[in-house]
Amino acid sequence: MAIKKVLVVDDSTADLVNLQEIIADAGYLVMTAASGHEAIKKAQAESPDIIFMDIVMDSMDGYQACRELNQNTKTKDIPVVFVTSKNQKADRMWAEMQGGKALVSKPYTADQILEQISRFQ
C-alpha cells in the first residue's frame, strides 16, 4: 500500500508540530489531532494510510483510541504506530496487545519516524 496520508495524534503541541514537520518535509500529507476522540473522528472521515499516536493523553489515551479504531470496520486496517515516552518491554507488549503495529520511543529521530512509514509502504 502506498502511504500518502498520515494522521499524527498528540496532546503536546510541541510533539505534534515536530512530527508534522518531519512527515510533511518527507512529502506526505499530514493531518493532526490533539486527542484520542479527535483521532477517531479524523480517521473515520479522512481514512489516513497510517497513524502515529501518543499513548498518554487526557480523556482518551492512545491505547483506548487504538482499540476503538481496530473495532471499526472503516478504520481497522489502518496501522497505528505509538510514539511515546513509555518504552519498557511491558509497554511494547501492551501496545501490541491493543492493536498497535509498532512503538517509537521519545525522544526519536526523523529517521525512526520515516522508517515506520517505509515499513508499511
PLM regions: where:
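The feature encodes the CheY-like receiver
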Residues: 16, 58-59, 76, 88
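A Lys-centered signature of the CheY-like receiver
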Residues: 54, 106
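C-terminal output helix
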Residues: 108-117
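Charged docking surfaces used in two-component/phosphorelay signaling
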Residues: 17-25
